[in-house]
A protein has these predicted regions:
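Glycine-centered small-residue hotspots that permit tight backbone geometry or close packing
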Residues: 7, 27, 270-280, 335, ...
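Short polar/acidic secondary-structure junctions
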Residues: 60-62, 151-152, 273, 352
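A short local loop/turn or secondary-structure capping micro-motif enriched for an aromatic residue
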Residues: 77-79, 170, 275-278
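Polybasic, glycine- and aromatic-enriched phosphate-binding surface used to engage nucleic acids
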Residues: 264-293
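Phosphate-backbone binding and catalysis cores of DNA-processing enzymes
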Residues: 1-107, 143, 210-267, 272
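Structured DNA-binding interfaces in DNA transaction proteins
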Residues: 84-236, 242, 246, 250-254, ...
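Basic, gly/Ser/Thr/Pro-rich low-complexity segments located predominantly at protein N termini
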Residues: 12, 32, 275, 338-340, ...
Length: 369
């Protein structure tokens, strides 16, 4: 109703006051989407980059040949900034005359939980990021998978549940089928200690389950010959995410080393995989493993292989992509699962916004309405 009220009030104003305005329209979600994109563009246009420097070290323990990376963090136990090359060179001069000593070692086990199954917004976001699909394309393919695909020996089969939903609810039958598949294919150790139940956010219309395969035991590889390329990619994305959501967490052995170098403090950190858990099927994140020495101890004197100053400039915020715009709308409680894709299509078709690669950029018209 709010969308209609806003549209009725604003659209006549646009028609009267902007050339060519008879083709213009406004609605609550549409207006917010354009406003977010325009505000971001203004931030980018007004952004003034600032110079700063960092110093990286490559260190190794005595008798070791492999080096590990550490970053300068503190001076006199406080965070500090290096603003220019002159300051960076002054710090380097001090560092070259002092020993590098391990001042602290922290070890821990970190647990990483799988992401929940998809809802409409997260499916659109992930398909954009991982598959390069625009939201309209994602929803069209999801509709095809939902309505049914001819599978040899089975006839027309709906392969995924309804794709317009904001609920994370999963039926007990689907959860049990996923657990059975996981145990058969990966082993009992890949099952969590208790069944995974995900809570939906408030104000959710719980008429439909989360987006999941209708038959969790029907792995994507079995369907590759009867699906189009796009259908296969999206089904695999939905299937992988759902099965992974019902798997055990990944476990990492983490190490953090503090290094004293005169008045300066460096830090090095890294991890090794203790148990891959759900990531055997659905890896995500951009963490990098590190060659941190496993047996480093407080008091160890380290050999300096390299000290490297690096110049940086602060960067403006990135333009919205479809994925990040949908996420922003969802986080601000704007719109419903069924509206995200049509809204993006509308603001582009009305020439308020245009695509520049994956980015969404306001047009000159979008900047003034």
């Amino acid at each position: 109703v709010l969308d209609r009220i806003v549209g009725y009030k604003l659209s006549p104003f646009l028609w009267k006051n902007i050339r060519g305005g008879s083709s213009l329209s406004a609605g609550r979600v549409q207006s917010v989407a354009v406003s977010l994109i325009v505000d971001r563009e203004r931030e980018i246009q007004s952004f003034v980059p600032e110079e700063y420097w960092s110093i990286d070290a490559k260190l190794c323990e005595k008798g070791e040949t492999s080096a590990f990376a550490a970053k300068l963090q503190t001076k006199n136990d406080e965070k500090f900034d290096i603003h220019n090359e002159e300051e960076a060179n002054a710090v380097l001069a001090e560092l070259k005359s002092v020993p590098f000593t391990v001042s602290g070692v922290k070890k821990s086990i970190r647990k990483k939980q799988p992401a929940p199954p998809f809802i409409t917004s997260t499916l659109q976001q992930e398909a954009s990021i991982k598959l390069g699909f625009q939201s309209r394309r994602t929803m069209r393919i999801a509709q095809e998978l939902y309505e049914g695909v001819d599978v040899p020996g089975m006839g027309a089969v709906g392969l995924i549940t309804y794709m317009r939903t904001d609920s994370l609810r999963i039926s007990a039958e689907a959860r049990a089928a996923a657990a059975e598949y996981i145990e058969q294919v990966y082993g009992k150790e890949y099952l969590p200690s208790s069944a995974k139940v995900y809570k939906s956010k408030g104000n959710v219309q719980d008429a439909h389950e989360a987006i999941r395969p209708t038959m969790p035991g029907l792995a994507p590889a079995r369907l590759k010959d009867c699906l189009s390329s796009d259908q296969y990619k999206l089904y695999k994305l939905v299937w992988d995410r759902f099965i992974a959501s019902q798997m055990a967490p990944a476990l990492y052995d983490t190490v953090s080393i503090d290094i004293a170098a005169g008045a300066y403090g460096f830090k090095a950190s890294g991890f090794t995989v203790q148990f891959d858990g759900f990531t055997v099927l659905y890896p995500y994140g951009d963490e990098e493993k590190s060659s941190i020495p496993k047996h480093a101890a407080e008091g160890d004197v380290l050999k300096v292989r390299e000290l490297k100053p690096n110049q940086h400039f602060t960067a403006p915020p990135s333009r919205f992509t479809e994925a990040s715009l949908i996420k922003a709308l969802e986080e601000n409680g704007i719109g419903r699962p069924s509206t995200y894709s049509p809204i993006i299509t509308t603001i582009i078709s009305h020439n308020y916004v245009e695509r520049e690669g994956k980015a969404l950029k306001p047009t000159s018209l979008g900047m003034v309405i």
